[in-house]
Curated annotation (Swiss-Prot):
Superkingdom of source: Bacteria
Keywords, ordered alphabetically: Methyltransferase, S-adenosyl-L-methionine, Transferase, tRNA processing
Family: Belongs to the class I-like SAM-binding methyltransferase superfamily. TrmB family.
EC number: 2.1.1.33
Lineage: Bacteria, Bacillati, Actinomycetota, Actinomycetes, Mycobacteriales
MF-aspect GO terms: tRNA (guanine(46)-N7)-methyltransferase activity
Annotated residues for binding of S-adenosyl-L-methionine: 91, 116, 143, 166
Positions contributing to substrate binding: 170, 202, 247-250
Organism (species): Nocardia farcinica (strain IFM 10152)
Name of the protein described by the UniProt record: tRNA (guanine-N(7)-)-methyltransferase
First-tier enzyme category under EC: transferase
One GO CC term, this protein: tRNA methyltransferase complex
Pathway of action: tRNA modification; N(7)-methylguanine-tRNA biosynthesis
Length: 269
């Protein structure tokens, strides 16, 4: 793959998990020979622990060796992993996989990789994949920024989905938000021309932040209404489906009176 950091033209502090140059003069993303980090990482996700149920563990043991991997530094050969050439989509923070499974089942011609750090959530998705016989999902456990930097080649993705990322509402935590300028630039560099970045949030403050960051990225153009385009035109131009199932989380947000803001940007061709 190409040189692994499309964020090189941005300050490293704007990428979640990357310290400022003042606190860490080492090259962003540099690791020790053993693969461990040479500095503490500020991540965009919260640490959570949880044990798998016996049924989840059984499904995990049967399925994970084939459909799952830990995030690493080696470039990913998605065609070999899926056993076919097909449009490649990644979903960052797939959680328990309700939307992941539904959208993959609706698009059997698409190869979909879900990325998540929380094993019990992944285990629920693994169970669903096994139960429903879904064959076009693969899973990566770990940090999505590492995936984008080290495992995904430039201009290889047809789509990137980020549904309801943690808004980190407190001002002092805004640096932890996933969708920062450098991260969006990294995503844009991994999208093929015509590929789409599809984002949804129920947090008004984060929506304003996301809108500004997306509008400032020169490789992206707004397709739907929230990004200055037209919803119907977005559906026509997008190379992947934009319809999401309403998850329990989203339904709870609706009942709490939170508005859902959806963004669709396309990579310039």
């Amino acid at each position: 793959m190409d040189g692994v950091n499309d964020a090189a033209n941005h300050t490293v502090e704007s990428v979640p998990g990357r310290p400022s140059t003042a606190s860490a003069p080492l090259e962003a993303g540099r690791r020790s020979p053993t693969g461990s980090r040479l500095y503490p990482r500020v991540t965009s996700f919260r640490s959570r622990r949880g044990a798998l149920t016996p049924n989840q563990q059984g499904a995990w043991d049967r399925m994970w060796p084939r459909i799952g991997r830990e995030v690493g530094d080696e470039p990913l050969d998605a065609d070999a992993w899926f056993g076919r050439q097909a449009p490649l989509v990644i979903e960052i923070g797939c959680g328990t996989g309700t939307a992941t499974a539904a959208m993959a089942a609706a698009e059997p011609h698409v190869n979909l990789i879900g990325i998540e750090v929380y094993q019990p959530g992944l285990a629920q998705l693994v169970q669903r994949i096994e139960r429903d016989g879904i064959d076009n999902i693969r899973l990566l456990r770990g940090d999505a920024v590492d995936v984008l930097e080290h495992m995904i080649a430039a201009e290889s993705l047809t789509g990137v989905r980020v549904f309801f990322p943690d808004p980190w509402p407190k001002a002092r935590h805004h640096k932890r938000r996933l969708l920062q300028p450098a991260t969006v630039a990294l995503i844009a560099g991994r999208l093929r021309p015509g590929g789409v970045l599809h984002v949804a949030t129920d947090h008004a403050g984060y929506a304003e932040h996301i809108a500004a960051v997306g509008a400032a990225e020169p490789l992206l153009v707004g397709l739907n209404e929230a990004t200055g385009g037209d919803d119907e035109r977005a559906r026509t131009l997008a190379p992947i489906g934009l319809d999401r199932p309403v998850t329990k989380f989203e339904d709870k947000a609706h009942r709490a009176g939170s508005a859902i803001t959806e963004f669709v940007w396309g990579k310039i061709e």
